[in-house]
A protein has these predicted regions:
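C-terminal accessory regions of radical SAM enzymes
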Residues: 334-406
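Conserved radical SAM core fold
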Residues: 188-191, 222-225, 237-255, 281-286, ...
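Distinct, well-ordered alpha-helical segments
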Residues: 195-203, 224-232, 288-296, 322-327, ...
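Flexible, acidic/Gly-rich N-terminal and inter-domain linker regions that tether
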Residues: 1-130
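Conserved Radical SAM active-site core
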Residues: 101-104, 109-127, 131, 146-241, ...
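Conserved C-terminal portion of the radical SAM core fold
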Residues: 261-322, 364-376
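Cysteine-centered iron-sulfur cluster-binding motifs in ferredoxin-type domains/subunits
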Residues: 135-145
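Flexible glycine/acidic-rich beta-alpha junction loops that bind and position SAM and/or redox cofactors
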Residues: 252, 283-288, 308-345, 380-389
Length: 416
């Protein structure tokens, strides 16, 4: 008994066992001592228990199979668990837990080594990527979106600004005879902190000095004061990540509401700045297609096609550190309650679900097909054919098509 107890105690190390309710801990321990689960089986049981609690579903005690053979128990338990994953989520009776009601974080400046200009962190030959360059003026984000990978890379309570950012921008050498697409919303939100530490001053001046750079600000905020009070260079794009009210309320904590994001985009567009919209992630849940359709229709009715440069679609894609961090948190989320399939080394929806959500989204925007650039983000090549009826042969072909379209929309010269 003591020997197996030692094995059990070793197995629960570096797991979320101690974060489970006390009665659940005692139940798992009792069943393990009785059935002699293996090291890996104990870890699986702990993760299942934690996920069910995070999803606000039944406790593992309620669904645990009553059988004296551990193989049968594990088979039935995993089957029951996968059934919870496979069914479309319902947020109707979902209760949030320990969600922050206000943004609380510390600001600091640091002289970062090197410079934050690099390739998009998810760029891959396995997926069709646009070769976006990223410019990290700020590290970490004040929003608390449950699915976001930023939380796995940075300290969420500390927002770090590069004290040498302005000088590094001035010293950046780019080919004046080439068009670049640089995004600023990868390691943080582009607009939520406004012009703190002179970040927007520096970026706007960089855009003015480099008219061959298409500079994209991506946000979930409505903090557009700087855009409204200043002249905006015509090579700047301002884009919003949008979702349904259901997902915003339950998974995009502290971010601006859908109404506020759309109103902010309207104000910016009316000033003559080209805008765009990212539906990433599209999330499957009960009646999700009809709820997303309402958002798509609203954009079609409130914006004209010549105000919008781009619309992108993407969905949930998880790396292991993010899943681990979600399990470590004392909160509730249904964001991982989905059928997992391998997607180029990450976990995502099966292709059948992706095809449904992407094709529905694209067809909903039919009036804009000829005037707005549509694309998929982080998706494998064959999904393009299933969604749009066409694909690009290479990432470079995709990049050229995107830059050409953006340049035309912005009325700037496109240079290969």
């Amino acid at each position: 008994m003591n020997k197996y107890l030692d094995k059990f105690n070793d197995a629960i190390k570096n797991t979320v066992f101690l974060k489970l309710p006390q009665n659940t801990q005692e139940f798992i321990k009792e069943k393990s001592l009785t059935l002699r689960f293996s090291f890996s089986e104990i870890k699986q049981i702990v993760d299942i228990a934690r996920d069910l609690d995070m999803w606000d579903e039944k406790n593992i005690v309620e669904i645990f199979p009553d059988h004296n053979q551990k193989k049968v128990v594990m088979t039935r338990l995993k089957k029951a668990y996968e059934e919870f994953r496979a069914k479309p989520n319902s947020y109707d009776n979902f209760t949030l837990k320990n969600i922050p009601q206000e943004q609380k974080f510390n600001f600091k400046t640091a002289d970062k080594e090197g410079f934050g200009l690099g390739l998009c962190p998810v760029a891959s030959e396995k997926t069709r990527c646009c070769n976006l360059l990223t410019l990290d003026a700020v590290e970490s984000c004040g929003f608390d979106c449950s699915y976001c990978s930023i939380q796995s890379f940075y300290n969420q309570n500390t927002i770090t600004f590069d004290s040498g950012f302005k000088d590094k921008l001035l010293n950046l050498n780019l080919d004046k005879n080439k068009t670049y697409h640089i995004g600023t919303g990868q390691a943080s939100d582009s607009l939520m902190f406004g012009n703190r530490e002179g970040v927007l001053d520096s970026l706007f001046e960089f855009a003015r000095q480099n008219p061959n750079v298409i500079l994209e600000f991506k946000t979930k905020s409505d903090n557009i004061k700087y855009f409204l009070e200043n002249d905006v260079p015509n090579n700047i794009l301002c884009t919003w990540s949008l979702n349904t009210p259901t997902i915003i309320q339950n998974e995009e904590h502290l971010a601006a509401s859908l109404d506020k994001r759309i109103k902010a985009a309207l104000h910016v567009a009316k000033k003559g700045v080209k805008v765009g919209f990212h539906f990433h992630p599209i999330v499957e849940y009960e009646n999700y297609l009809s709820e997303y359709k309402e958002v798509y229709d609203r954009l079609l009715s409130e914006f004209s096609a010549n105000e919008v440069a781009l619309i992108s679609f993407g969905t949930l894609t998880f790396i292991k550190p993010v899943i681990k961090q979600l399990r470590d948190r004392e909160f509730r989320s249904k964001i991982t309650q989905m059928p997992f399939e391998d997607a180029s080394g990450k976990s995502s929806y099966p292709d059948s679900i992706k095809q449904e959500m992407f094709k529905h989204a694209y067809e909903s925007f039919k009036p804009w097909h000829k005037d707005v650039f549509f694309y998929l983000c982080m998706e494998e090549h064959q999904m393009w054919d299933k969604t749009f009826g066409y694909n690009y042969s290479t990432n470079n072909d995709f990049e050229r098509a995107m830059l050409s379209s953006y340049a035309k929309s912005l009325n700037i010269e496109y240079m290969i």
